[in-house]
Structures are given as C-alpha cells and as structure tokens.
Amino acid sequence: MWVLLRSGYPLRILLPLRGEWMGRRGLPRNLAPGPPRRRYRKETLQALDMPVLPVTATEIRQYLRGHGIPFQDGHSCLRALSPFAESSQLKGQTGVTTSFSLFIDKTTGHFLCMTSLAEGSWEDFQASVEGRGDGAREGFLLSKAPEFEDSEEVRRIWNRAIPLWELPDQEEVQLADTMFGLTKVTDDTLKRFSVRYLRPARSLVFPWFSPGGSGLRGLKLLEAKCQGDGVSYEETTIPRPSAYHNLFGLPLISRRDAEVVLTSRELDSLALNQSTGLPTLTLPRGTTCLPPALLPYLEQFRRIVFWLGDDLRSWEAAKLFARKLNPKRCFLVRPGDQQPRPLEALNGGFNLSRILRTALPAWHKSIVSFRQLREEVLGELSNVEQAAGLRWSRFPDLNRILKGHRKGELTVFTGPTGSGKTTFISEYALDLCSQGVNTLWGSFEISNVRLARVMLTQFAEGRLEDQLDKYDHWADRFEDLPLYFMTFHGQQSIRTVIDTMQHAVYVYDICHVIIDNLQFMMGHEQLSTDRIAAQDYIIGVFRKFATDNNCHVTLVIHPRKEDDDKELQTASIFGSAKASQEADNVLILQDRKLVTGPGKRYLQVSKNRFDGDVGVFPLEFNKNSLTFSIPPKNKARLKKIKDDTGPVAKKPSSGKKGATTQNSEICSGQAPTPDQPDTSKRSK
C-alpha cells in the first residue's frame, strides 16, 4: 500500500469529536466478505535495464521522414499521424484530417496513440511501421485494462462511495469538510470533479477515468487521521502507484485550453479551479515523480504553472519536472508565507489569481544577476533545515555532521575490505528511500538478489528466514519503495552506465544513485598507470552527471592497502587525489576489530563541503537485522576533528557526566523527525 503522510489543519474545534472519528476511521483491507486477500499481484524484482537501442530526437525525425510519416515538433514529444488508428478515426465531420494523434517521446522514443490507446517502445513502433512481427504483438501494444482483481475492487469501492453532500447526517458532513479542509469548497466543485466519499473508511475518493471518459480505470482514496492537534492524510491508490497514471481533472480539459496549473494534491486542484476558473491537473505521485507516460497529455499547453507545495522540496521538484516539459513554457509559484498551498490559500482568504500572476519563469539565460537570485537566496536563509537536505532517521549523528542529504552532490565512501561497506551503504540508502527519495542501485560486486535480501532484512529489522509467514507483508511494503536496480554485474563501460543513469533520471525521477563499487565497474583491463587516469576520468564524469541532473551520486571506492594498525585517511582512497577533490562529502568506515577486537567500528566524515563540519561517531552492528544501530546514550559521543589527518579529539576530563567542550558534542541517540515531503502549513 502506498502511504504518504501530510500534516494538515488544526483540530481545536474538533477535539470533542476526535474520539468518534478515530473510532470509525480506517480503510478496510477488503470490502467484500471472506478472508483477507492480497490487494496486488506479485511482480518480479524491479530492475532497471538499459534501453535496447537508445534513440535521439534527430534519429526519430529522420526515420519518420524516411517512411513518409507526417509529423509536427512539440515541446517534449513529436506528433505524427497514427498508423494504429483507422482513417475514419483521424477525420472530422468534414472528412479532413484534423489532428495528429500519435505522440512520440523525444527522449525515449516511447509512443502513445490517443485515438487507439496503442503504446509501446520505439522498437515496437519501428516493427509496426515496417510490418515486422505478428498481429498478436500489435494487439499487445494496446493499453491493457487493469488487473481483474483491481477492476473488481475499483467498481466495488466506487459503487459504495456517495457524494459528500448526500450524507444523511449533517454533523458528519461538517466533520468531513473540516477534516479535509473543504469548508470553502462548494458542492458544485466536488460534483464537477466527480469526488465521492466512502463512509466505512472515512475517505475521499478521487476517480481515474479513461481518456474520453469511457470507463473507470482506478481510484485514489484519501483518508484523514487525527494526529496530535492536527490531521495527517494517507493515500491509497488502486492500482498500485507504479501503474497509477491518473492526471486528476483531465476529463475537464478542453482542446482549446492553452494554460494549465499542475498541483501535487487533488484538494489543491479543487481549490484552484473553483477560485480561478483555470484548468487544473494533479500529478498522480505528487512531488515524487512525473512519469513520462503523462507527457503527451500536457503537449497542448503553451503555459504550464507548477504550484506543488509550500516547502523547498516542492520547489526543487517543480524545477526538475519543468526540465521534462520544456522550461520555456513553465512557470513556478515560489513557496512563501504569502503563497501557501492552494487549499490553504483559499481557506485563508488569499487571492489565488494574484499568486499565479507572480509565478516565476523556469527558464533563464546562462548569465544572471543577483536580482534574479535574491529570492532563492532568501528561500534558503528562511528554510535553513530544508536547504540542508533530507535528514536520516536511522543515523541522527550523521545529521549532526552532514546536516542532511542534498541533491546534486557527490559522496565518496570507503572502508577496509570486509568492514561492511555494502551493508552500511545499503541501510544508508534505504533510510532515504523509505522517506521517498527515488533511488537507483548499481551493484557491480554482488547480485541484485543478494542485495535485495540484505535490504529487505534491514527494512524489516529482523531476519525473515524463521518468519516466512511474514514475508509477504514485508515484501509488499518493500516493493512499494521507489527503489530500482541496474542489471549490470562486473565490468561495464562508463558510457553504458551513464546512459542508464540518464534514462532512470528521466523516466523515474531518480534523486540518488549508488555505485558499488568503482573498481568492479572498471574491471582490470588497464595497466596501473592507465587505470589511475581512467579512474580520474570516470570520477569526473560522475561529478558532471550529479551537477547537470541535480542528482546525488554515492561512489563506493576501495582504499589502497594500509597497515592493519593504521586508520584510513582521505589520502587512503585508491588512485590520485581526484576522488577527494571532486567529492562534496567523504565518508570512511573505520574498522578497528583487528586491533581492539570485533565490533569496534565508527564512521568518519572527513570532508563536508556544505558547511565544513567533520567528525566521527561509533557504529554498532546488529547481526540479526544487519543494521548499524546507534549505541546507548551513555556510550555515544560525537567527536569533532579539525582535519582528516589529525588525531581524534578526546573527550574532556571532567567530573561531570556528559561534559563537553566546543569541539565535542554529546549524541542524544534519538533520531530527529525527518522532513516530511509534503508538509502542509496549519491554517489559522
């Protein structure tokens, strides 16, 4: 189940009714009688492979011209006459061809026919045009209906849901309106968007209709839960999120519409459309991802405004999505106190049309002045914690030094052979992935199955060998993480790896790539001198990729051979100084088990370009869960060091327990609350 928590509105006026609401909330796992059953069918492990034949926009144009297929150049797609549609479908009442209904993605070559709903890869399109293959393959290109089990559940839930204004109890209507912040959203707006309410689950139901409104393809349920003095929301999609490609509000879009506002929540679209009258669409996965399959539906618009949220994460997501849609037609609403989320703006009495007019262009020239940057600088100064990046929930001491995980950076991670580098970095990445960071794993040393087994054990925080009855539960939850794996193993060319990473960033909006490890990826073909030069070149390529794509890259590099009784330093990284120079962060897993006995490990941050803080903190390995937990509070001590070559700062001698100096801090051992991806401000 896809779950996304979002803080919401104050409940001071609803506290007397809290018990009643909490007693009735909860989405039933199965609305039909009988034993519980699984919602989704099992699928194979998500593995990201390189497209068979990468294609460029120029090659697509040449191919279409060579086969006499008329086409038009669009913002992110090429529009052509569809060979999958019948001639009668392509002509209007006058008998003249009215539009090009085939959309071909300029980056991937993936196509979609709006008339016949045929879709497929660029190789599928070539095979169809050239008459290769058989009828069965061409029939397979047609968009498939949802799984039978899913479609049955969709119909069952939709039939049980009723319009909110038809609830028999007026007190229940008022309670639901307040819980979801709909006090100023009219019934006409809810009716226009076909929004319903599921009483047994106390959830709003947003439908996903097929293009043209021909049928119901899926649902999104939004459940409100009391949390402290506010409300949190849980989203459930049917089918599962990876197959849920609904642009909520699409049936209301006219062919003549040239402007649209994109939001990350359905409730925001309701508020915007009601207040401004402009066409609004909601991205199916919020700020997490913009699937390329949705780009054809956005081709007709000359102006696209992103109003995704009120935090820096929403702002960064808007800039990333604008790159897919052609930045020259995209505008961004900057988060701020006077520019909250659309629903909050409506409830707070703001002028939403005026806010939209202040949207900033996503595209600018290569040279800018401070006048164009001052608002972004102010945004970082006013949101220091968010600007520092996403915080780890499992490694609070790492937050104290690195402050957070930031996009566009390069992290180099090293440690002695057998110290647990892969085990640690898998938990390190899993922590971020569990918080919604789209992650791509490139494991060149161990197989994906073995890596997935380790990560699943860490995710469940316990071995599943003796609890196989719980495997499906944890596997279902693990399967819904935005986690992908390259299928490479052993030596691969840097060009192939970078092309795969580029493809993943475009298709899956990957924000974090792990390469484990650099030496295995390079292989052993080069001579020693050539090998160092090749490694420097590869590190430079990864550095450029991280910067150009605003994607964090973590490189695992083996150290050079050192004496067992010596600690590793930044200079211990194999190769020249290129790795440490290009890296924004350098992490070293120190293993002292050969000197002081087993289990004595600690993580050293020897470089931190963000704010310069460096230091070390102890790690304690839990063999049962394969995790590196934080030691007890009385043992945990964060140590600041001046540089990576100096000795570790000793704790001060003091009779008082926990005494510290300016260069030493006590670790609390308590994980700080991680930044929520879509935290809503409380309305007054």
Curated annotation (Swiss-Prot):
Result of altering residue 456 to V: In MTDPS7; infantile spinocerebellar ataxia phenotype
UniProt-reported outcome of changing residue 360 to G: In MTDPS7; patients manifest multi-organ failure; requires 2 nucleotide substitutions
Notes concerning its domains: N-terminus enhances protein stability and hexamer formation, which is important for DNA binding, and is required for DNA helicase activity and, ultimately, for mtDNA replisome processivity.
Topology in the lipid bilayer: Peripheral membrane protein
Any single Gene Ontology cellular-component annotation: mitochondrial nucleoid
Subcellular location: Mitochondrion matrix, Mitochondrion nucleoid; Mitochondrion inner membrane
GO process terms (BP): DNA-templated DNA replication; mitochondrial DNA replication; mitochondrial transcription; protein hexamerization
Taxonomic source organism: Homo sapiens (Human)
Result when mutating residue 315 to L: In PEOA3; reduced single-strand DNA binding; increased heptamer oligomerization; increased stability of the closed or 'compacted' conformation
Region of interest (Required for hexamers formation and DNA helicase activity), residue spans: 121-372
Region (Disordered): 637-684
Expression (tissue specificity): High relative levels in skeletal muscle, testis and pancreas. Lower levels of expression in the heart, brain, placenta, lung, liver, kidney, spleen, thymus, prostate, ovary, small intestine, colon and leukocytes. Expression is coregulated with MRPL43.
UniProt-recorded name of the protein: Twinkle mtDNA helicase
Primase-like domain: annotated segments: 215-335
Residues covered by region (N-terminal region (NTR)): 54-214
Keywords: ATP-binding, Deafness, Disease variant, DNA replication, Helicase, Hydrolase, Isomerase, Lipid-binding, Membrane, Mitochondrion, Mitochondrion inner membrane, Mitochondrion nucleoid, Neurodegeneration, Neuropathy, Nucleotide-binding, Primary mitochondrial disease, Progressive external ophthalmoplegia, Transit peptide
Binding-site positions, ATP: 415-422
Transit peptide: 1-31
Region Contributes to single strand DNA binding activity, annotated ranges: 1-121
UniProt keyword annotation of Hydrolase present: yes
